[in-house]
Curated annotation (Swiss-Prot):
CDD domains: REC_OmpR_NsrR-like, trans_reg_C. Member of the two-component regulatory system GraR/GraS involved in resistance against cationic antimicrobial peptides (CAMPs). Upon phosphorylation by GraS, functions as a transcription regulator by direct binding to promoter regions of target genes such as adhesins, exoproteins, transporters, toxins, and proteins involved in cell wall synthesis. Down-regulates the expression of many genes involved in RNA and amino acid synthesis or glycolysis. Keywords: Activator, Antibiotic resistance, Cytoplasm, DNA-binding, Phosphoprotein, Repressor, Transcription, Transcription regulation, Two-component regulatory system, Virulence. It comes from the Bacteria. It comes from Staphylococcus aureus (strain bovine RF122 / ET3-1). This is Response regulator protein GraR. The gene is graR. One of its GO terms (molecular function) is transcription cis-regulatory region binding.
Length: 224
């Protein structure tokens, strides 16, 4: 597994690199924190570990840049005790978030869970769903409508899959949150709202934002 570790604390970087390499992870770091995207594009990581507080530009800036060109899983690290950091990371499409200090074995477990969720599917099995006049590719986390294609985060795709498998039925927020926790995603009541809003924003790019309806006090419904 190729890991890009974007961490400016060299002591922490070396400690994490050593631990991760013992699990056969191939770890790359950043030499110039003004050119994170250069390393990202040349190394082509399978997962990015991204610190929030960095020199020159913060982790949120680099997450936006990565999301412009890739749907690679991103796990944020933060030493700040600020719940808004977690909300912001969700809004930007991160897959997980950990607050420093943390246990390295928990980080490794999260990385393995993300890898299983994103990459370990049977190559010849193409899982698709049809929704209205769009084709949803569950293995690629993409939605194609006509000539347009959008890409979702894993959390957004799980939410959408839950809703469209129960089309025209109200799905409670608790049901969605429970399913996401079962899938090892990190979602609270507040961040579920963030994810649904972000999902709608992406659907608006293919004129489908009205296909998911909020049922106040009850949950959400995907229309046929």
């Amino acid at each position: 597994m190729q890991i890009l570790l974007v961490e400016d604390d060299n002591t922490l970087f070396q400690e994490l690199k050593k631990e991760l390499e013992q699990w056969d992870f191939n770890v790359a770091g950043i030499e110039d924190f003004g050119k994170v995207m250069d390393t990202f594009e040349s190394f082509n990581p399978e997962i990015v570990i991204l610190d929030v507080q960095l020199p020159k530009y913060d982790g949120f800036y680099w997450c936006r840049k990565m999301r412009e060109v890739s749907n690679v899983p991103i796990l944020f690290l933060s030493s700040r005790d600020n719940p808004m950091d977690q909300v912001m990371s969700m809004e930007l499409g991160a897959d997980d978030y950990m607050q420093k200090p943390f246990y390295t074995n928990v980080l490794i477990a999260k990385l393995q869970a993300i890898y299983r969720r994103v990459y370990e599917f049977t190559a010849e099995e193409k899982r698709t769903l049809t929704w209205q006049d769009a084709i949803i590719d569950l293995s690629k986390d993409s939605i194609q409508k006509g000539d347009d294609t959008i890409f979702l985060s894993k959390t957004e795709m799980i939410i959408l899959e839950i809703l469209i498998t129960k089309k025209n039925q109200i799905v409670s927020r608790d049901t969605i949150i429970t399913a996401l926790w079962d899938d090892e995603a990190f979602v609270s009541d507040n961040t579920l709202t963030v994810n649904v809003n972000r999902l709608r924003k992406k659907l608006s790019e293919i004129s489908m934002d009205s296909a998911i309806e909020t049922k106040v006090g009850k949950g959400y419904m995907a229309h046929e």
